[in-house]
A protein has these predicted regions:
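N-terminal Rossmann NAD(P)H-binding glycine-rich loop of SDR-like oxidoreductase domains
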Residues: 1-21
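NAD(P)H-binding glycine-rich loop region in Rossmannoid oxidoreductase-like domains
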Residues: 32-72, 76-78, 93-96
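A conserved pocket-lining segment of Rossmann-fold NAD(P)-dependent short-chain dehydrogenase/reductase
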Residues: 58, 156-176, 180
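Active-site Tyr-X1-5-Lys
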Residues: 111-135
Length: 317
């Protein structure tokens, strides 16, 4: 039996659905009270923590407070005799300044508050659970229906006719479908080594390619314009300076670095050790599942027929 913490959220929903294909699953919201958490965790062997503890869409400040949700989960897991915790973190803990592909041996150089907070969560969890098996997953850039940070903002701009991207969105990234993160969770639950962190990826592509595919699926025609990275960063820095701590900001400097700097991972180690592989190898493969969601995003007015815009081999601009 598997318990997923983060039900009702983007990643939690996809992880639950992927796990349910292979094993019985209990879903729990991140804000469930202690009594509900205690009741749910009694009968499970593995707990998957994939709730959004920090939102990259907000102006964050780094602090060393023990992660409240993880602390509650750990205490409940101890009382219930849970065998293993699979914690979904992020490849962003390595920081934004790696030119070569990241491996598990790459240096951890987090810069942004979000990156540092996520790494602190990992460290706290591993140091505080010597009596429990903990496996950490570090997914590359996650995409899929329900994603609530990048695509809603970018698609709203697309619907208005143009979107400005650092470097034109042509910098190579590693993406992974949210459902494949769920499959990696199952592999980590069965075969991950306690105390280890694994990178998990899907395929290499660009933000520009994701937006072009999304625009076709949603029936939106738009121009993608290249903005110099330095100018995009300066604009984001100005926006953040005007925002209160914890307030939403778009685009923030983290978003600019997410689009404008390379973030590629080499997950060959996890594929060998966990004996898993992703099922989604391109944006186009997932677009039939994403089309309705994309076309219903706030500010997006378009048709759902991909043929209405342009064939897949034609650039939007």
């Amino acid at each position: 039996m598997h318990l997923v913490i983060g039900a009702g959220e983007f990643l939690g929903n996809h992880v639950s659905a992927a796990l349910a294909v292979q094993a019985p699953v209990i879903e729990l919201n991140a804000d469930a009270d202690d009594e509900t958490l205690g009741d749910a965790i009694k009968s499970v062997e593995v707990v998957h923590t994939c709730a959004e503890t920090w939102s990259p869409a907000h102006r964050l400040r780094f602090r060393r407070d023990p992660p409240r949700l993880l602390n509650r989960v750990v205490q409940a897991a101890r009382r219930a005799g849970v065998r293993r915790i699979v914690h979904v973190s992020t490849a962003d803990v390595y920081g934004p300044d790696h030119i070569a592909k990241i491996t598990e041996r790459s240096k951890l150089r987090p810069t942004h508050a979000y990156e540092r907070l996520k790494l602190f969560e990992e460290s706290w969890l591993l140091e505080s659970t010597q009596d429990l098996e903990v496996v950490v997953l570090r997914p590359a850039r996650i995409f899929g229906p329900g994603e609530n940070w990048m695509l809603p903002h970018l698609m709203r701009s697309m619907a208005r006719g143009r979107v400005w991207l650092p470097g034109g969105g042509r910098v190579m990234q590693t993406f992974i479908a949210a459902e494949d993160v769920g499959r990696a969770c199952l592999a980590a639950a069965d075969r991950g080594k306690p105390g280890k962190a694994y990178l998990v990826g899907g395929f290499d592509a660009t933000w520009r390619e994701l937006l072009e595919s999304s625009a076709r699926a949603a029936g939106v025609g738009a121009e993608i314009i290249s903005l110099p990275y330095d100018l995009a960063y300066l604009r984001a820095l100005t926006a953040e300076a005007a925002a209160a701590a914890g307030a939403p900001v778009w685009p923030g400097v983290f978003a600019v670095d997410t689009i404008g700097k390379p973030h590629q991972v080499d997950d060959s180690h996890s594929r060998r050790e966990l004996t898993w592989s992703p099922s989604v190898g391109s944006f186009e493969q997932l677009m039939p599942q994403m089309a309705a969601w994309l076309s219903e995003l706030p500010g997006v007015e378009g048709r759902r027929e991909p043929e209405a815009i342009s064939p897949p081999n034609r650039s939007l601009s």
